[in-house]
């Protein structure tokens, strides 16, 4: 036991002295990444770099002491980064540093097998060695462990502030050629202040994530905010890239148990950790949390084994066909690929898995739409259209998997910012993505009235989701009408309609939710919903009375669905200040007449040529029915 520690002590000398001995021109140096960057060693390296030429520095993500401005070191060293962050973004886009677009799952092979990637020196930070001589890579296992295993010379900063994380995070001290004990605080990432846009997106996403899901979240404010709205879930698992304070919040809520995970049962799995000291203390020597290198965490074959694997990642731009740009703004690199593609591909093939793209509808200044007809010139496609499942903005969720280009375009325009919807629709028409007569979604606010979404269980224990209709329901509504018996169609339209073409149905789904309101009862998940019933009113602005109609699918009748929908639409109409309801009902349609009579208001009616005109006012509670014209 003491032999290990003695061996380490023998190699402890001044960091400057060590670096002077091992540095020479033209070397390739790997530096530990993220909040695990060995800042003390980096500061010493920066003091010596002006004495050398053409040194190549490789790092994943800089959160520590590496400079933002590489101009003074232009002749001495050049940074190659595998992921672009705030500290390297300007240098990369000014041509003073290089960005390497790469799947993180392929990095171990690159480091170990490609002779052009052989590291001469690796500078890393570790926890103090245990009694057996093992040090933990702490909060930066990722590719640091892989670099240590392949570098010719390894120089480790031993920092007692570094958590001793468990999993496959350990390196024996004998692997280090030099060590330096230096304690200093680790960089901390403050959880950003609340964002109304991020919160709205998170609320939309929360229902998509089922109990027992295993979650991966990418870097960014919105993926982090999703965690806040998952507190009520049960038995969630975590298999992710970067563990943050948002994850800690979710863990402390009791929603995370990992008991449904296929792999690493009951364990939280990550490869990096970036957050507060509270988070670092949580992962320290915690058997609930396991850190693994990139070859494990990003392994698609392993990820896809998880039941209900959900990958939640942000985007900078998405075109109307579903191509996602997540690393650049045109030719300007903003971030990187990281594990984006690895997790998206794996989750899309996981049993019950889902891929969710989150993005604000506009740029931060509101001047540009992030949903576009075509990606900005120079933008890199990180996720192809074939792997995208759900897309969420603050205006709703679009489901793209298995959809045509036309259906994708309509779904994405429907969740774009209203200021850009007309423009997007016109551009979609010009490239023949949609019908030439396609109606654009509403362009004013308030938009989709999500407050009227609810759930209801009908006998014999059949849950249905009740919500206002959307433009993306066009095909589902067509299918619903075509399955109705002839008699029901006649009752609904008071005519023998045999066809429900696009030009007619699109007018039924593109509504303003004020003068026209349609509520549907659906079964199935977003994007695969089937309509069980529909109720609609159309407001007569002269009388302030709303004409109502209702239809229920043949397989869903006699369960109270029609009655519920009429009651619900009546509640909405009353809430909007409408005076009352009116309906035109065939005398033979006794069911609809009965529904009207159980709404709790006085029902008035008159019969002409076999059709009842039935009406009620919300200011007249149920009393004796009268047959007279409404005023």
Where are these regions (language model features)?
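Long, contiguous binding/interaction regions
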Residues: 447-631
